[in-house]
């Protein structure tokens, strides 16, 4: 368990579900302790509410479930939109990525995956073309989530049908990727991130 005064995020060394919060914390410039493990030991498991990672500790407050962690960080740091309606629109995109897109590419059926990508990333691309942002008139967790999800699928390669997500097909999402990766905190995180399979 971390004894640091800054928040801590515990997850495996790979990108996986920890990537969303790691990129978010880096983008927002929030100091945190990035604790990586190779396995969930019995001692660690005993501290986990549901026996799984990632887990986020902010003082005495403990959260698990990757999308919940990201929402908490974003809400705490005013990155969930400017009002209640925008917050729920952000939440809608976060849920789509976690509930529909990620489970599908982990057990891919090419035809279904292609349609799923076109459905969601096509919608995201259209919204970015229209307004420049996925929700409201400023960058939110929704934009970051689409960037991280898009980038992770391409990182996973053809097993995840990554060729369907080209810069040519989704130029605005490609611009979103450049935007986040030009951020000093995100650029530093990417440079220091170890090469892993997942």
From Swiss-Prot:
Record key words, sorted: Acetylation, Transferase
Cellular component per GO, a single term: phagocytic vesicle
InterPro entries: Glutathione-S-Trfase_C-like, Glutathione-S-Trfase_C_sf, Glutathione_S-Trfase, Glutathione_S-Trfase_N, GST_C, GST_superfamily, Thioredoxin-like_sf
Keyword Nucleotide-binding assigned: no
Protein role: Conjugation of reduced glutathione to a wide number of exogenous and endogenous hydrophobic electrophiles.
Enzyme class per UniProt: transferase
Superkingdom, natural source: Eukaryota
Domain spans labelled GST N-terminal: 5-81
Enzyme nomenclature, EC number: 2.5.1.18
Reaction catalysed by this enzyme: RX + glutathione = an S-substituted glutathione + a halide anion + H(+)
A Pfam family hit: GST_C_3
Gene3D superfamilies, A to Z: 1.20.1050.130
Keyword hit for Protein transport: no
One record GO biological process: glutathione metabolic process
Positions that bind glutathione: 11, 45, 52-53, 65-66
Annotated protein name in UniProt: Putative glutathione S-transferase alpha-2
Domain (GST C-terminal) ranges: 83-198
Source species: Dictyostelium discoideum (Social amoeba)
N-acetylserine modified-residue sites: 2
Family membership noted in the UniProt record: Belongs to the GST superfamily. Alpha family.
MF-aspect GO terms: glutathione transferase activity
Position of the signal peptide: none
